[in-house]
């Protein structure tokens, strides 16, 4: 039972870290990255569909994203979805391909992106600590089946797992901050 609680807690913490990785990848950091478009969906035959399912997204140059729809009829819908997104990019549509030119980031924009990165990191840490709290609560529910020492050891083990994941979050945030500020 104890092992199951630990595994569940670690699995949930791992998922929180994976969500952070996705969020960080979707941030505009001055370089073209197909993950920037992960959250954008375009209407395709009446259904909102992720761009990755509508087109091939490539990076021909460091600051250019190229979107080549598999169905040319979806070109306008993709262009519209990009325009209404919060990316702030202007698509160049040549009739077959959409090109997105990623502008150079100003110092102010970089600082705002770093604030967002830190917020994502803090939200992830809160999620990880929440998982720790849930795990500790489940361990305390087993009080009748375990000795005080075993409960203490289990709580310490969950704390070690938590510390490890919080450290990973800090490392990811530091790397992303340096990437944004060094462009």
UniProtKB/Swiss-Prot annotation:
One of its GO terms (molecular function) is ribosomal large subunit binding. Disulfide bonds: none annotated. Keywords: Cytoplasm, Protein biosynthesis. The keyword Repeat does not apply. It comes from the Bacteria. InterPro entries: Ribosome_recyc_fac (IPR002661), Ribosome_recyc_fac_dom (IPR023584), RRF_sf (IPR036191). Its main location: cytoplasm. GO terms for cellular component: cytoplasm. It is found in: Cytoplasm. GO terms for biological process: translational termination. Belongs to the RRF family. Responsible for the release of ribosomes from messenger RNA at the termination of protein biosynthesis. May increase the efficiency of translation by recycling ribosomes from one round of translation to another. This is Ribosome-recycling factor.
């Amino acid at each position: 039972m104890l092992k199951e609680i630990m595994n569940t807690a670690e699995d949930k913490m791992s998922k929180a870290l994976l969500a952070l990785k996705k969020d960080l990848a979707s941030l505009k950091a001055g370089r073209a990255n197909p993950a920037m478009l992960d959250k954008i969906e375009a209407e395709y035959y009446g259904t909102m569909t992720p761009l990755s399912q509508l087109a091939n997204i490539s990076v021909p140059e460091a600051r250019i994203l190229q979107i080549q729809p598999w169905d040319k009829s979806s070109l306008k819908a993709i262009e519209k979805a990009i325009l209404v997104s919060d990316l702030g990019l202007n698509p160049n549509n040549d009739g077959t391909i959409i090109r997105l030119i990623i502008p150079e980031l100003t110092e102010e924009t970089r600082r705002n992106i770093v604030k967002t990165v830190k917020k994502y990191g803090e939200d992830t840490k809160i999620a990880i600590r929440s998982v720790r709290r849930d795990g500790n609560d489940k361990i305390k529910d087993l009080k009748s089946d375990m000795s005080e020492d075993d409960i203490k050891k289990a709580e310490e083990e969950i704390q070690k797992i938590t510390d490890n994941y919080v450290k990973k979050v800090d490392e990811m945030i530091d790397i992303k901050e340096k990437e944004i500020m060094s462009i």
